[in-house]
Amino acid sequence: MLVLMLAAAVATMVRAHTLCRVHTVRTGKVFKSNIQLQGDPLFYAFPNTFVLKNVCKADISVYLGQKVFLTIDNFESSLLPLTVPKSLAVGVPSITSAHFVSGSLVLFVISGKGYSYDYYENTWRKLEGISEPVSHISGDVCCFKGSFCLELSNNLFAYLRGGQIPGTNIYFSDNGGFSFQLMNTDKLSHLTGTLGGIFHLHSMSQVGVLMVENNLGTFHYMEYPLNHSMGIAFSYKNLLEVIMKPYQRGFMVLWNQKSILVSSNSGQIVEHVRLIDQKIFTDLDVEHANINIYSVASNAYELAFLVAEDHLYYGSQSYMGTYVIKLPHQPLWSTHTSIYFEDIGILQVLTPVADPHFAAYDFDKCTVNVQSSLMDEKLALQPCNVELLESTMINTMFTIDMNSKLKLSALMIPRKGENPTPLVMVSNPHALGFKANLNEFGNTFDGNSKYKLDIELKQQHHWGNSDFNFTASIKRHAISSVTVDIADKTLSCVDLKPLSTLISVGCDMTKKIVVQNKISACTMGILNPVQLQKNYTYTIEKEAYDPINHNGEAQDDLIVFYEYKDLGCPRLVYYDKPWKPVVELWKNGIVEEIMNAEYVISEINGLVTYSYSLTAATANCRSQPQNWSTFESDIENEEPFLWNRENYVSCHEDNKDNPLLWPNVEYQVLGGQTNNKIIFGQRNGIYTFHLSVVDPYYSYCNLNTIFSVYVHGALPVTKFQPLLTILLMVTTTLLTAWLAYAIPKQLRSEKGQRLLGFCYQILQLCLGVCFCTWLRGKLRQWLRPRRVKDQNRGKVRVAQKHPET
């Protein structure tokens, strides 16, 4: 019994000093196999190892080392080394960069050329558009659902690290690497030095360029408001690999064998990692410490690296700094060993093992439970000062549209006797601002206080407390992450990860506009909805419309098919009454408001029998307003609906380049600060309009809709000019009145008597002629029936003489 107790005690002591236990993954090798590798085996071009994780699919990874392996089950099966077909003729099959994109593709740079590999179909393809050597492909993967997030993931760069700027070619892709295009580098013309990298920094809605000159690295930015500033310079003696940490929080890791640097704000400040040693905090100088970093692992909140001197370091990365500690020693390192995070607080040490009898490699895996390892008393770490930090905002992407706001909340329960400080951070303060309040609202069963953190977010412009040059352009959509963390959290809070989510300051896809239809031509009995649904057509007269291509006048009437499914019953409008549509803004199927933004309309069939009630002068324009003629050249090129919020210029602002020269032209913008209306011409019939919101400050969405109206009450257009008709009527009336006076007076005179006698004779002659003509007509009518009867009698006699036999 005593022996058993001693054995248990020894086993407990051994476990206490062991980071992890190695187990070997070996599958599919029961029977002997003659499988041989097809193609050229790939290898990593650098002397270290690295495991690239697919951020959105946790079980899919690529191991880069002297051999390359791709797993879809987290290295839980034996694998063949990855090869590239000989038909691609890649030359030396060395990989300098790898990047996962959406779907089942991973992009590789092999010997200066780009290739894509579909790991489900096992197919390779050379990337299109890259004509010069490149060394790296960079991107920032977004894992939320939706087209907006997919668009972020599809933005990529391909570049040659170490290339001279200006001079080196940079390629970009907006379709997930299917094809690349040569980037216009005019914005980089002021930069000099060598290129350390170019990155999509979605956390700040920026493109960042790492430039190296005189052993100093500096991040430069291409978009306003950071395009005239740069990050703080840092030491850059040897080429650094750049890791973009996931979830668009702005965290980066820059490392090589002799250096490891971090940034929490997309490169604006790059600093050293802080080392914790017996409660003493110092900057980790890798070169001075005489260690060689061999493999680096990171996830959204953690960092670890394995050094060739056989030590493993672990740390957490937050906005307050990156702190690491050397874990208890255990022999782990070999030239093939690499590390990666399998989950929060779970670090995997991976070593491929060759099999002399099979082509497939096995894997030695050693799982490090970081939380358990940090409990070692020798590390002297303080316990976590927070018991709970949770919120419903995680794993959800939110949208803040123009003039909107968002409210979030989080629950915090501190450790008993502790008073931690919550921290709220946004990665893009140029676009997104917030206000936070912390309130105590009760206790747990064991007496701990509960706190609720309320956060209100809206565009930085609308808080009104930032310098104009600090805020991003309000017209341009942006992205920012929001993170809730504990400012004074200890390193032992491994399982208490920060709360983070992504905010899109942009178009709310649940919004739409609808033109109100309270009185329609169907409800008033003018049109029949049943007939409208039966392929109803109507005719537009050639005089009433212009061809869509504006090439001369219409030659024929236009027959239009009415789209009842999209348009419904037309709204009823009286032709002579100025009218404008009432536009409703809907969100998530609910009416939000009656829209008062500026918008424009266009009759989609080319009808021109309507006008506007205001001119540039009566609309109080201070510059020449835009109108549809401004965009006619683009319409001829069959471009989409072109007058929108992106190219609209208000005439109510001074514009030296476009002064008000023609104040009497039509003002063709509806809504906003004017009461402009539509005036329909003297024509009854259906009009089908396309409506587009052009106000750039109403919504980031391109809000548009189509609707129809039926104009009634117009009398037919007269064939004569009204002025000519009135002139003829007045002349005829005056002439008749004059004749009624002049004729009786003239008849009393001798000359009048002679004229009267002459007229009498003419009348008698006419009557005689008419009477004779009448008698002759009557005689013909009487004689004609008699001839017909005589002819019929003759035919009867002939028939009697010659009867049929």
From Swiss-Prot:
The chain crosses the membrane at residues 724-745. Coiled coil: none annotated. The keyword Membrane applies. Residues 17-723 are extracellular. Testis-specific. Keywords: Cell membrane, Cell projection, Cilium, Developmental protein, Differentiation, Disulfide bond, Flagellum, Glycoprotein, Membrane, Signal, Spermatogenesis, Transmembrane, Transmembrane helix. InterPro entries: CATSPERD/E, CATSPERD/E_C, CATSPERD_b-prop, Ig-like_CATSPERD. Disulfide bonds join 20-366, 56-143, 142-149, 384-493, 507-701, 522-569, 621-651. Glycans are attached at residues 227, 419, 469, 535, 627. One of its GO terms (cellular component) is CatSper complex. It is a single-pass type I membrane protein. It is found in: Cell projection, Cilium, Flagellum membrane. PANTHER family: CATION CHANNEL SPERM-ASSOCIATED AUXILIARY SUBUNIT DELTA (PTHR33722:SF1), CATION CHANNEL SPERM-ASSOCIATED PROTEIN SUBUNIT DELTA-RELATED (PTHR33722). Component of the CatSper complex or CatSpermasome composed of the core pore-forming members CATSPER1, CATSPER2, CATSPER3 and CATSPER4 as well as auxiliary members CATSPERB, CATSPERG2, CATSPERD, CATSPERE, CATSPERZ, C2CD6/CATSPERT, SLCO6C1, TMEM249, TMEM262 and EFCAB9. HSPA1 may be an additional auxiliary complex member. The core complex members CATSPER1, CATSPER2, CATSPER3 and CATSPER4 form a heterotetrameric channel. This is Cation channel sperm-associated auxiliary subunit delta.
